[in-house]
Amino acid sequence: MPSDSQVIVVKPSKGWISLKLKELWEYRELLYFMAWRDIKVRYKQTVLGAAWAIIQPFFTMVVFSIFFGKLARVPSDGLPYPIFAFAALVPWTFFANGLNQASNSLVGSANLIKKVYFPRLVVPISSVISGVVDFVLAFAVLLGMMLFYGILPTVNILWLPLFVLLIFVTALGVGFWLSALNVQFRDVRYTVPFLTQFWLFATPIAYPSSLLSETWRTIYAINPMVGVVEGFRWALLGTDTAPGAIIFVSSLMAFSLLVGGAFYFRRMERSFADVV
């Protein structure tokens, strides 16, 4: 008697076909489900719940304002230091949390990966997407601070979606690399906190990139988050220098990380179920 069950044959592929973007789109409902699951699990049995999305960048801003703004008197491009720092910490927190979640996503979903076939790219992507809720809450506080300081956005705010996209692309690109490596080498999860801490101070969050010359700023933009942070300040706070070259270099680097990470992830994917 013929069977009505569907048989999925997984074959190796090369080039752009190996990314299987069409297949990824077909599993978009699973992507939504896993992202929503991550959001609920994150604040399960917590007293403050989603308030942590605001507390983390806010108290970091307070610490930076005391030590860098008051004591070290670091310049802030003519802006009040608290909002100068917070405007950078909002996108940074989205990136750092997305990176941390994505790097451990495959190991955390080991049981599902071993039992069910689906595009494994769904796992780190959903981990990064789940941080959007936290980002929106922190961004609302940033808008409130802008009103408090009497800072009105200019037409530059129309560029803001580009910088949000760059956060997502950078977190996803690095997340692809780290999540795949973490399956093979569990030491990766211990290095991620050090990586994000180093990256924090290698990004112009507590200080402006204007401390560097124009030439060095362009080289500095090899760090994709430089373009994101300076772009956020320019779009929302109206800093004087339009970071055109910085954004271009950072965007190029971010998409290079994404494409390279996706290909590496796909190449390692065939061994995930056996190793994880």
Segments (PLM) and residue ranges:
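Hydrophobic transmembrane alpha-helices and immediately adjacent juxtamembrane helices
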Residues: 1-276
